[in-house]
Amino acid sequence: MILLNMNLQEFKQKYNYDVATKMMQQYLDIKFAHLDCLLLFRMGDFYEMFYEDATIASKVLGIALTKRGKNGEEEIPMCGIPYHALENYLTKLIKENHKIAICDQLETPEEAKNKGGYKAVVSRDVTRIITPGTIIEENFIASDEPNYLASLVIPQNKETASLCYVDLSTSEIFVVNVPEAEILNELARLKPREILLSENLRSSNLADNIFKQLNFRITYQVDSFFAVNKCEKIILDFYKMKDIKGIGEISSGQICTIGSILEYLSLTQKQNIPHLPIPRIINFHSYMAIDVATRRNLEIVTNSQGGSKGSVLSTINHTVTKQGGRLLYNFLSSPLTDITKINQRLNITDFFYSNPAIVSKIREYLKRISDIERCLTRITMNRSSGHDLLSIKYTLETATIIKGVFFDVYGVNLPDFIEKIIKPLTGNEELYNLIEATIREDAPHNLNEGGIIKHEYHPKVAQLHDLINNGKLHIEKLRDQYRKETGIDSLKICHNNVIGLFIDITAKNANKITDPKFIHRQTTVNSVRYTTNELQKLESNLVNAKTLVISLEKALYADICRQVIVKSSYLRMLAISLSRLDVFCNFAYVADEYDYVKPEFTNDLSFNIVKGRHPVVEKALQRESKSFVYNDCRLSEFERIWLITGPNMAGKSTFLRQNAIIAIMAQIGSFVPAKSAKIGVVDKIFSRIGAADDLIKGQSTFMAEMLETSAILAQSTKNSLIILDEVGRGTSTYDGVSIAWSVLEYIHDKLKCRCLFATHYHELTFMSNFLPALQNYTIAIEELGKDILFLHNIISGAADRSYGIHVAALAGLPASVINRAEQILLKFEKTSTIKGKNILSTESNNFSLFNLKPNKTTISNKLYAKFRTIDPDKLSPKEALELIYELKKMV
């Protein structure tokens, strides 16, 4: 790829500019202005790419890489795609995160020759730049999730970053200030397709993490692109304001992000930007903080491979509209933290849950509506078709019907919160009538085909279509008129490619033509040919009718679109209302279908889930005709930490995840998979469940685990929910136990937040003796001879052994390996020589892992009490050895 910092002289030298053809010089001039793009250069019926662009595109598109002559001594690599198949190929390029410049011909070859002679080069220029963050076409973007372009600015103090993000396809724009430590987490929430960054951040850790952890496309701009004075002027000009305070109370960093996004849109869309509302200022703390690892671990909107199957979203998404799907996606990505707003959403869900008949009707009607948000954007950017206007018309019609459903049932007694949602569903009959009167039901997608405007809307349109559809009848009518005038019954009107339409009369009847309006054109052996002004006019009308009607229809269509754009604010409110109806009806439908319950919220540290289930796992089991084993979770101010032990495959990780997911579902306004749920609002959720070596970043499993754990301890607050699974397992046993122990102490004593902590280190269960807010729980199992049965129930108590060999057998290890493992285990149980270490004690509330001071005056009592608690048959080899060391240390 061409180096972006190459100057013009270097560029021309590299590509032999001075000896290139005029056409290739034109290409190179345009390419130099778009070095960061793949340039698609229109050549007749093809878009062609040259040099490095051709090499890249041929691989991505799977098309042949050929050559187009030589430039000096160098052959020019080239590939091309048919212009009519452009969209299909663009989809592939966009998927690979390429930035594409479309260079079109601005005149025909004939027009070029008329201006500059037969060697003239057709005028060309870039008409549009397509980037992952600026796409609006439905073929290129997912219909059920947003497509954000973001701009990120980090001020000098680096304490707070500013972030602006816009979805061009729906004309939504937001701005937020984000603590520096939360930048990656906020980007993970938004999942922008493209991020604008200053060049001075190119080599920063932030840019490296955005690329490696999130894999988002970064578009770098020169530092001056984000200059505050320049950006402020851009904002004022765009919104036609005199004072930046018209935006609201925004920081200088936010001014830079908004201005840079508007400038980038202007550059890529060639000034053709849709009307964007004033940016909505977002309070970062109004949403639950969920970090990158937690989003991945919980599989909230995507699964661990980046797909949708098996995610929480795929399980609870039964929306029936595209905009409803996007709103649900946004809800799940951004759970609320304001208890008032959460309860408002839950009340709406409860209303629909209590009215299943209304839900059923509304969902059927919602299936008829279109994605008018994106329709409207295409209209404002002059990339629409008649189908977009028809979609708006049908949606307006259906919205009126939907509003009627509510009043049929409730009359004027609707709750205020429902009245507020459905208010925009009516009130624009004028717009409906306009589209109904103008746009044909069979309007084609392509404006150049004509046939968009109803004939009765404009007399000239009717006249031209009459000519197109009934041209033969008009010719026959004129022929009959001339036969009557001349008395020549054999008179014909014919056509050839030389003289066009003409009147044909046999030679013997030529003397009957006396009227001077008949103009002689040609004489042959057997006939004489004439024309008239009337016939020439008819011919001209027939020849030009198609062109004229298309031109007229385009003008009328543009005028109709302008009238629609005037109503854009109303249409956006309508789209929001319909999407909210879809989401809340979806919540009600899912709650009824899957037996979910309305959660109750408090301002304390309650987390009381009765018979909770994992929504995704439950549905997967149901498909196999199996039942999910529900479990309770009862965290509170006085029992904040559950330490959960038990073998692998018993269900610990599922239990951890399901409770985090229940909190998220509850705080988006959804009912939850449980018999009852009482939750103190969670401000942040952190999970560390499993880890893999991050080879790209050169990090081991243990380093990745420690980094995640460190971030959790640094960012959690008293109102957070922490989910930890097997902390410390990536290192030696004693190091691992020590780390897990101290992490638990820190959470208990310093953070004082709710935590579910799963571990294989049974030594940690003794901490319940001196950490009053920590309680032990385990997974119930049933031993059947040498086999075990996982019951998946969470019960009070601690696991007495790991059952690792049983799990290994279930995993399919060879029988010889299992038998040998059992022999070794038996030997360890009899004569263990594994070194132990005493880290178990219960002697005081001031216990510290590294400060064991036994009280010698109570040794006898302690030994007696200790021996009474020992069951030799239930001790693992490791536990037995550690017990010996403990007893030795006590005496």
From Swiss-Prot:
Keywords: ATP-binding, DNA damage, DNA repair, DNA-binding, Nucleotide-binding. CDD domains: ABC_MutS1. The keyword Transmembrane does not apply. ATP binds at G646, P647, N648, M649, A650, G651, K652, S653. InterPro entries: DNA_mismatch_repair_MutS, DNA_mismatch_repair_MutS-lik_N, DNA_mismatch_repair_MutS/MSH, DNA_mismatch_repair_MutS_C, DNA_mismatch_repair_MutS_clamp, DNA_mismatch_repair_MutS_core, DNA_mismatch_repair_MutS_N, DNA_mismatch_repair_MutS_sf. SUPFAM superfamilies: DNA repair protein MutS, domain I, DNA repair protein MutS, domain II, DNA repair protein MutS, domain III, P-loop containing nucleoside triphosphate hydrolases. GO terms for molecular function: ATP binding; ATP-dependent DNA damage sensor activity; damaged DNA binding; mismatched DNA binding. Pfam families: MutS_I, MutS_II, MutS_III, MutS_IV, MutS_V. The keyword Magnesium does not apply. One of its GO terms (biological process) is mismatch repair. It comes from the Bacteria. This protein is involved in the repair of mismatches in DNA. It is possible that it carries out the mismatch recognition step. This protein has a weak ATPase activity. This is DNA mismatch repair protein MutS. It comes from Rickettsia canadensis (strain McKiel). The lineage of its organism: Bacteria, Pseudomonadati, Pseudomonadota, Alphaproteobacteria, Rickettsiales.
